[in-house]
Amino acid sequence: MCHLTYGETMVTLIVLGSVMTLVFGLERIVPLGMKRMPSPRRFLATDIAWFLVAGGAGVVVTLLLAPLLERTAVGPIATLLEIAPTGVQLAIGVVLYDLASTTIHRAMHKSDVLWAVHKVHHSSRELDALATTRAHMLENLVRQVPAQTVLFVLGFSGANVALVAVLFAGWAVVGHSNLRVGARWIEMLFVTPRVHHLHHVPATSQRNFATVFTAWDRVTNRFVSVRSAPWDEFGVPGEVESYPQRFVDAVREPLKEIHGRRHARLTA
């Protein structure tokens, strides 16, 4: 198995940061964006902090957990995978990673505890590239570890799992961005910014769970393609105005909510 070194891990994070910076700039050019972005951007410091948290979570998963997860590989399947070209491995990896991530994402909307954690991601009032990494550190582990475990069990090397994660994250950045993707035929297969933005609108937050492929939502009757108007409001359903936007408050909010639910059950 091929492990990623610390240096290679940092290069991966730099590449993702560069992609996010590029998209962040392009989406603010009026002809390229779906709507004019507010200037200055609200809660910029908060989302930079969440970006750093996401980077830290990536380092932990890659350097500490990945070497352990590689040991879960099922021999016969891993042998078959090893003879496949790298491009085929990556394509299979992205499909499986997106399926696993979509399944976990739907679970986060169904479980009260996981939803309390996932609310942080839905709290973005404006969607752009930087909104991609607005996610609680607990969510980073809940979303990344199971999805990567699926690949490791099938025999993917640490390096290829990292490449799959980079491709997935890059598409997530585009999906959260304000970029205008005009060709509707693309949405027959892929999630576009227009499609994913509908998931962040409270009225349709139970739709469009996938990050890369629309097929997962189509086969479960969860896909919606109603046109997202410029005035659609993003935010946590029922808490659009009240959910904390400051970083420290948002870090504590899921823990407070989970503790409150537990206390209510014990005293009921």
Regions found by a protein language model. Name each.
Residues 1-11, 67-89, 147-161:
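Helix-coil boundary and interhelical linker segments in multi-pass alpha-helical membrane proteins
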Residues 26-44:
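Membrane-interface helix-loop junction between the first two transmembrane segments
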Residues 47, 211, 215-222, 247-262:
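A transmembrane-helix-recognition feature enriched in membrane-embedded lipid enzymes
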Residues 50-61, 84-233:
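Membrane-embedded catalytic scaffold of the fatty acid hydroxylase/desaturase
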Residues 232-268:
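A membrane-cytosol interface segment of integral membrane proteins
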